[in-house]
């Protein structure tokens, strides 16, 4: 398993944000490649929980040599939305600055 951090544009000096992906199987595998992500709408937590659980199963499968392809897991596809709260309520569906839906508006956030 390989963990990768993909940097995002920083909202303020001295801060950092990343999307984290977990990669299972051999990178040069010619077998199937499955990509799984959760929480593009960051307030949708069940998918995050499922992928966290799946990661432990993939760890075991990889250690036992049972993976014939590759699997990429991104449990939190929207760390910006996950960090947005207002009066103790998580508001991960819409960007607070513009009010735009994260699943309809895709700003370039790559650093």
PLM regions: where:
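Structured catalytic-domain cores with a bias toward divalent-metal coordination
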Residues: 1-111
């Amino acid at each position: 398993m390989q963990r990768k951090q993909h940097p995002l544009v920083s909202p303020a000096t001295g801060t950092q944000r990343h999307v984290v992906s977990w990669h299972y199987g051999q990178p040069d595998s010619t077998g199937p490649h499955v990509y799984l992500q959760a929480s593009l709408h960051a307030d949708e937590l069940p998918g995050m929980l499922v992928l966290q659980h799946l990661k432990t199963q993939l760890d075991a499968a990889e250690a036992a040599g049972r993976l014939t392809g590759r699997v990429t897991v991104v449990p939190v596809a929207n760390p910006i939305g996950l960090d947005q709260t207002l009066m103790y309520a998580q508001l991960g569906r819409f960007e607070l600055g513009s009010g735009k839906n994260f699943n309809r508006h895709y700003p370039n956030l790559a650093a």
